[in-house]
């Protein structure tokens, strides 16, 4: 008994409809991660840098309490999800090597713009969440012991 190509074609078409939105969702979460946490070549890493970057990246409506920018190339950050990372706690990855980072902390006051931030710069290991080999959430950073 031969199966007609109709049902197989229907399964194939349904697969095309279901898979791309999932991949697009992963890509949009990765893009959001990069917008919020990646700055390859920072110009200054002081309080003004934080105020400028937080505003430029639309993280000031309302003023975000804390945000960390990772300085380095995207492929090295992405590699934390693979060879440059180790499992850490539940579903997280910790970088094997430290990254140059700038953490911006809201100095208080109104949660409405203009937002004022204090910068803290250093080399730290970063902890991120990954989905399908892409970073999608920044969890924390800390100095190596």
From Swiss-Prot:
Residues 1-24 form the signal peptide. InterPro entries: RNaseA, RNaseA-like_dom_sf, RNaseA_AS, RNaseA_domain. GO terms for cellular component: angiogenin-PRI complex; basement membrane; cytoplasm; cytoplasmic stress granule; endocytic vesicle; extracellular region; extracellular space; growth cone. It is found in: Secreted; Nucleus; Nucleus, Nucleolus; Cytoplasm, Stress granule. Secreted ribonuclease that can either promote or restrict cell proliferation of target cells, depending on the context. Endocytosed in target cells via its receptor PLXNB2 and translocates to the cytoplasm or nucleus. Under stress conditions, localizes to the cytoplasm and promotes the assembly of stress granules (SGs): specifically cleaves a subset of tRNAs within anticodon loops to produce tRNA-derived stress-induced fragments (tiRNAs), resulting in translation repression and inhibition of cell proliferation. tiRNas also prevent formation of apoptosome, thereby promoting cell survival. GO terms for biological process: actin filament polymerization; angiogenesis; cellular response to osmotic stress; central nervous system development; hematopoietic stem cell proliferation; negative regulation of apoptotic process; negative regulation of cellular senescence; negative regulation of smooth muscle cell proliferation. It holds the Pfam family RnaseA. A motif (Nucleolar localization signal) lies at residues 55-59. Disulfide bonds join 50-104, 63-115, 81-130. This is Angiogenin. The modification Pyrrolidone carboxylic acid is found at residue 25. Belongs to the pancreatic ribonuclease family. Homodimer. Interacts with RNH1; inhibiting ANG ribonuclease activity. Interacts with PCNA. The active site is at residues 37, 137.
């Amino acid at each position: 008994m031969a199966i007609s190509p109709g049902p197989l074609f229907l399964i194939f078409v349904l697969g095309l409809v279901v898979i791309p939105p999932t991949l697009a969702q992963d890509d949009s979460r990765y893009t959001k991660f990069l917008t919020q946490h990646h700055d390859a070549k920072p110009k200054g890493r002081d309080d003004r840098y934080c105020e400028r970057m937080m505003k430029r990246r639309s993280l000031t409506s309302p003023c975000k309490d804390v945000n960390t920018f990772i300085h380095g190339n995207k492929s090295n950050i992405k590699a934390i999800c693979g060879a440059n990372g180790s499992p850490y706690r539940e579903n997280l990855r910790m970088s094997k090597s430290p990254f140059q980072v700038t953490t911006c902390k809201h100095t208080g006051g109104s949660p409405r713009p203009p937002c004022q931030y204090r910068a803290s710069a250093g080399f730290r290991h970063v902890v991120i969440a990954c989905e399908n080999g892409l970073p999608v959430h920044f969890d924390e950073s800390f100095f190596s012991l």
